[in-house]
Amino acid sequence: MSSDLPNTIVNRTTVTSPDRGEEIPMDVLAAAQPAKLYILIGTNALVQPGNDDSFLAYYAKMLDDLRMTLPNTVFYVQSVLPATQAEIADSLPGLAPDRLAVINAAIQQLCTERGCCYLDLNAEFADDAGCLQSEFAQPDGVHLTVSGYSKWVSYLCTHVPYDKDNPYQAGSTYYLSDDMKNLLSDIP
């Protein structure tokens, strides 16, 4: 299921899944009733400069609708990732660091007001100028490389509240520390 616009969820828009055909994202989530839901949404909606107030209003409504539909779910809302400096200048002005800082601060406030956990991916992925570090970016300047995805997974595993049911989280007997990962990677 792919939907990068909060209004797709709020307006119950049908999306096409390659595996399941047409579906409405909110209905899929309601049927699944997940214990946890990780949300990373907004990059495509923000590519071009536009009405930030409208985007944030839909984001707030999306979180409210999700909370009502999934009352027992823990929500982990991730910040909107930046693009590389070259891509922002060439074709993605809407992902400028100053704009994303305002958007992400507003999303963080929405999370605080609604009891959602906010995860600041930019702290890990942005350079000093607030742009996506090129070492983690595909040539398009937006999508992550394999090392970027690995860093993302590691961040998620180490930046959520401890949960005994999550075996890959720090504190779990199954979690591999960086020292252990390095030791295992040296084995032929």
Ranges and model annotations:
Residues 29, 66-68, 108-111:
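N-terminal cationic-hydrophobic initiation segments that often serve targeting/anchoring roles
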Residues 32-37, 70-75, 113-117:
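Loop/turn elements at helix/coil->beta-strand transitions in domains of secreted/extracellular proteins
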Residues 27, 65, 139:
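Short, flexible active-site loop motifs that bind/organize anionic cofactors or intermediates
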Residues 38-46, 64-101, 123:
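Active-site segments of SGNH/GDSL-like serine hydrolases
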Residues 59-64, 104:
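Generic structural signal for well-ordered alpha-helices
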Residues 1-60:
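Conserved SGNH/GDSL esterase-like catalytic core that processes O-acyl groups on lipids
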Residues 4-6, 71-77, 112, 152-159:
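Low-complexity, flexible helical/coil segments
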Residues 82-188:
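Catalytic His-Asp segment of secreted/periplasmic serine-dependent ester chemistry enzymes
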